[in-house]
Each structure stands twice: as structure tokens, then as C-alpha cells.
């Protein structure tokens, strides 16, 4: 854990890094930081410091340093989380923007690092596209002027260092007799009427192509961090889902209809991945499956529905084939319906891809759960080594629910590193080399390292780590910056006044969160440097 004095150092360095263009991790929302350090004034660092020592470097570890997704589902259907106002007038656009900014500010302040923004409902979207109708709840007949809520949300997430994934409701299709959905009008064979509503048929190859096309159309418009599929399954009471004609046409080579249905969802993910490769997209792909992976023989009580048996999701195969980068099972249960299934996800799926536990703070209001259940489940997910947590939904983590908000703030009080996704292992970044520092007479330290020229083009970023030692020999580790885009960073000596020594190390990080450390760190004798600077000013 970090010492209080060291927390003060981090806060001071954060300000210094912001002023000098070093992209430091922040605890409160700020304006976007410059990506390049300003030139040192009044003079450039001139003497490569002799008070330095090179030594093998290993990234610091500890309870306060973890790779973890800290996510929330931001629901737009019916404006449940956002927006409350339609954007069909200038005033409506302004109110939509202001309310989203307040939400993102609050999420950043509370320690989140990932947002799942619902961009497609049951066949309608919140972004302009030629393929599906615009959600009337958000904009009436259309957005005012050139306002684009997805682009605005993406810009605001970037400003706060938040990852944004586009949340697609995949197969349900809302339609009315008075105003049929265009798919029902133009392609009636694509959808099956089931339990009073329509559901796209995953067994129809044209449907799978359509879904993959929606994704590529979206990614050509928006450089989001990922695509997140919800309702990526067969519907409730799937045994009554009337896809017999589709099975006869496309599924007879399978041993039974259940195996065919699972294969349809798996093939959908293959087609999505093929489509992403066709447009050279590095967007992550994730699915929110049901929270109970499969039946557990010795559970000792009814299961309810499960992902594998009830709705034909096969996350184990998805993980083995690398078709998803992570999964977020919706574990909206407690006690005996939570812990055994949590371990199931860990044992069967997490060896292949990260598993992020989807938790249900909405249950506090809707079914009377005590807020402590959420705290227990966060801790259980961490104890089992899962990759993070995600909350459904944003409103139920905010100011209306102070108890659960405090629990989340406490759980997220230390910054987290982004997850490292298996797909990135095939293209690990080069190791930073030649880490050194130049000290200026104005008390600045320019830390720099070398990288291959192509590193900047392929999206490589850098993390700068420090271990400080005070006069009493106490050592503390911190992450000074997690999002540097250039191979240099400027520090200020006055922010290190309480320390006699600082050891620096840097990692190169690719777009999938996979990092490569420098082989040699750099240790600076701060006490000797301060004395040398004082002497040079006489």
C-alpha cells in the first residue's frame, strides 16, 4: 500500500506532469493533456547527469498495483441512464452533452476505467446509419445539426482516459404493426416471431452477415476500443423457438439442433472477426453471456437457465478459438448461485480469455439486496483472480445509492492498469532501450528512452514507473504515467524534495495492453543532483 507522503508525491508529480505535457494518471477529470513535453525553459537540459546508475529493472508489484477492468453498462434504451432529454433542438443537444459529461466525470472520479455505451437497441441505433432506424427516444425524428452522440461520447471518454466499448443488443428486434421494422419489410425470413416479439435467426447465414456488416459499418465511423455483444444468444424458452425450417436448410450436418445452435453463435463471432480483419480494425470483441455458465451436477438446488444448455452460448469454445478478447458474464445472483458459477468461469474460461464479473447493484433497489453483497462479490472476484468487475447499470452506482457508491470508490481507490489481452501476445512491443536522464539547471529532469521508429505508428504507448527512497531508507513504488505517447517525459526536481533517490523504469505497451519492460532501469541520486544544481547557480 502507498504511504501518505508518497501519495502527496504522486499528486504533486501529477500536476507537474500535466504542466509539462507528461500524460499522468489522474484522480479527477481534467482537460486532455498534451502528448508532447514542452521545451525546457529557459534552457534545454544540458548535462547528462553523472549521478546515475543502471541496474536490471523489474516492474513493481503490490496490492495497490493490479491489472483490472472497472466497468459499467451505460444504458440508453428508454433513456434509463442517459439521456433524459431528446437532442432534436439546440437546447436538447446541450442538455444531452452536459448530462453525459456529469456522468463521465463522476465515473472517472470514482475510479472506473471502462464504459460500455449502448449504441444499438433492438434494431434501432443512437448513431446515424443507413441500415437501421434512429432511436426516437434519443432524438425524435433526428439529431439537431451535426451532433453525433457516439462521437461526442468517444471524445469525452478519451479526455478522461476511459476506454469506450460500443454495446450492441444483437438479435432481438422491436417492431410494431403500424410501423414495421425495415428488416421485416425487406427480409421477412430473417426474423422469427417468438413470445410476442421478433428475434433475428442466428441460423440464417444472411442474418450473420448482416450483424457482421453492422459492426464494420460502425467501426468505419468510430474508433472505439471494442464491440460488446449483449443478447448474443437464443431467446427465453428457446426450446419453443421455431427455427425448424432454418435447421433443415442449414443445419442437418450437425448431430442435433442444440449443437447447431451453439455453432451458429460461434460462426457469428468468426464472421465478425473476419470482418474486422477486412477493415484492419484492432477493436476488441466481447460478449455478455448469461451468468451461469453451465449446469453444476452437485449444486444441490435448481439452476434456472444457463448459458450453455438454455440459450446455446459456448464461451469455452469462443475463448479457445480466440473469437472474443474477454467475456462479461451477467452474474446477477448471490450466495450459492454466485460463488460456484464464479469458480466455473475461472476454471473453464479464464485460462483462455479474461473474465470480467458482471454484478447487479440494481438488485439493491429492485429486490432488496443489502449493499454489502456487492462488496462481497467484488472481493470474491478478486480472490478468484478474475479480470475485473462491471456493474449494471450506471444509475445504480451513482448518487442515488450512496452506500454502494462508497463501496465501489473504496474498491477502486488505487489506479488500475488496463488488461493485457491474449491477442496482443502475437505482437509484443519492442523493449525500450537506452533509458537515461538529462538534468537542467532549472531543476527539470528529462527522462528519455529509444524505440524503433515504427512504434509511434502502431499505437505503442509507455508507462513510467518510479521507486523513491527517503532519508530513512523507506521505499515506495508508483506509476507516474500510464499513457505516454512519446518516448520521453519531463519531471521537476522540486516535487522530489522529500526523497534522496529515485529509480525509474519504463514499459512499452501495445494496443492490446501487452507490455514489454526495459531491461535496465535508471537510478538517480537526487541528493547529489540537488547539491550539484545549487553549486552551479552560485
Model regions: which residues?
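Aromatic-lined carbohydrate-binding/catalytic grooves of carbohydrate-active enzymes
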Residues: 110-145
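Substrate-binding cleft of secreted/luminal carbohydrate-active enzymes
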Residues: 315-338, 353-424
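Pro/Thr/Ser/Gly-rich low-complexity, intrinsically disordered linker/stalk tracts
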Residues: 403-458, 512-538
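Solvent-exposed loop/turn segments flanking beta-strands in beta-repeat/beta-sandwich domains
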Residues: 452-476, 501
Amino acid at each position: 500500500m502507498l504511504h501518505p507522503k508518497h501519495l502527496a508525491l504522486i499528486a504533486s508529480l501529477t500536476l507537474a506532469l500535466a504542466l509539462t505535457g507528461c500524460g499522468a494518471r489522474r484522480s479527477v477529470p481534467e482537460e486532455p493533456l498534451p502528448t508532447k513535453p514542452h521545451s525546457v525553459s529557459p534552457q534545454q537540459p544540458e548535462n547528462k547527469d553523472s549521478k546515475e546508475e543502471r541496474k536490471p529493472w523489474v516492474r513493481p508489484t503490490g496490492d495497490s498495483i493490479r491489472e483490472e477492468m472497472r466497468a459499467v453498462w451505460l444504458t440508453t434504451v428508454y433513456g434509463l441512464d442517459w439521456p433524459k432529454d431528446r437532442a432534436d433542438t439546440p437546447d436538447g443537444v446541450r442538455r444531452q452533452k452536459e448530462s453525459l459529461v456529469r456522468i463521465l466525470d463522476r465515473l472517472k472520479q470514482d475510479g472506473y476505467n471502462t464504459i460500455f455505451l449502448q449504441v444499438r437497441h433492438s434494431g434501432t441505433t443512437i448513431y446515424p446509419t443507413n441500415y437501421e432506424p434512429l432511436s426516437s427516444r434519443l432524438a425524435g425524428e433526428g439529431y439537431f445539426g451535426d451532433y453525433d452522440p457516439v462521437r461526442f461520447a468517444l471524445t469525452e471518454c478519451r479526455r478522461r482516459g476511459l476506454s469506450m466499448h460500443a454495446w450492441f443488443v444483437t438479435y432481438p428486434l422491436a417492431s410494431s404493426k403500424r410501423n414495421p421494422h425495415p428488416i421485416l419489410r425487406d427480409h421477412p425470413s430473417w426474423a422469427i416471431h417468438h413470445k410476442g416479439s421478433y428475434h433475428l435467426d442466428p441460423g440464417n447465414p444472411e442474418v450473420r452477415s448482416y450483424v457482421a456488416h453492422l459492426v464494420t459499418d460502425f467501426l468505419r465511423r468510430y474508433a472505439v476500443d471494442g464491440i460488446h455483444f449483449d443478447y448474443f444468444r437464443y431467446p427465453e424458452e428457446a426450446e419453443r423457438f421455431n427455427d425448424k425450417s432454418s435447421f433443415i436448410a442449414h443445419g442437418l450436418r450437425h448431430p442435433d439442433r442444440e449443437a447447431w445452435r451453439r455453432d451458429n453463435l460461434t460462426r457469428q463471432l468468426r464472421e465478425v472477426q473476419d470482418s474486422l480483419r477486412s477493415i484492419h480494425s484492432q477493436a476488441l470483441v466481447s460478449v455478455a453471456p448469461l451468468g451461469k455458465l453451465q449446469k453444476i451436477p452437485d449444486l444441490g438446488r435448481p439452476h434456472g437457465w444457463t448459458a450453455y444448455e438454455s440459450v446455446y452460448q459456448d464461451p469455452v469454445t469462443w475463448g479457445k478459438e480466440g473469437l472474443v478478447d474477454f467475456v462479461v458474464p451477467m452474474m446477477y445472483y448471490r450466495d450459492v448461485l454466485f460463488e460456484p458459477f464464479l469458480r466455473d468461469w475461472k476454471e473453464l474460461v479464464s485460462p483462455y480469455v479474461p473474465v470480467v464479473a458482471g454484478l447487479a447493484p440494481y438488485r439493491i433497489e429492485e429486490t432488496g439486496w443489502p449493499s454489502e453483497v456487492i462488496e462481497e462479490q467484488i472481493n470474491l472476484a478478486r480472490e478468484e483472480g478474475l479480470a475485473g468487475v462491471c456493474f449494471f447499470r450506471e444509475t445504480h452506482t451513482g448518487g442515488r445509492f450512496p452506500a454502494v457508491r462508497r463501496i465501489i470508490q473504496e474498491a477502486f481507490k488505487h489506479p488500475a492498469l488496463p488488461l493485457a489481452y491474449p491477442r496482443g501476445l502475437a505482437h509484443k512491443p519492442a523493449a525500450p532501450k537506452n533509458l537515461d536522464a538529462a538534468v537542467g539547471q532549472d531543476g527539470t529532469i528529462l527522462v528519455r528512452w529509444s524505440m524503433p521508429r515504427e512504434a509511434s505508428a502502431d499505437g505503442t504507448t509507455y508507462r513510467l514507473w518510479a521507486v523513491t527512497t527517503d532519508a530513512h531508507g523507506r521505499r515506495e513504488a508508483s506509476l507516474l504515467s500510464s499513457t505516454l505517447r512519446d518516448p520521453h517525459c519531463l519531471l521537476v526536481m522540486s516535487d522530489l524534495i522529500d526523497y534522496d533517490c529515485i529509480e525509474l523504469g519504463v514499459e512499452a505497451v501495445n494496443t492490446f495492453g501487452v507490455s514489454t519492460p526495459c531491461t535496465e532501469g535508471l537510478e538517480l541520486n537526487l541528493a547529489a543532483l540537488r547539491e550539484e544544481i545549487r553549486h552551479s547557480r552560485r
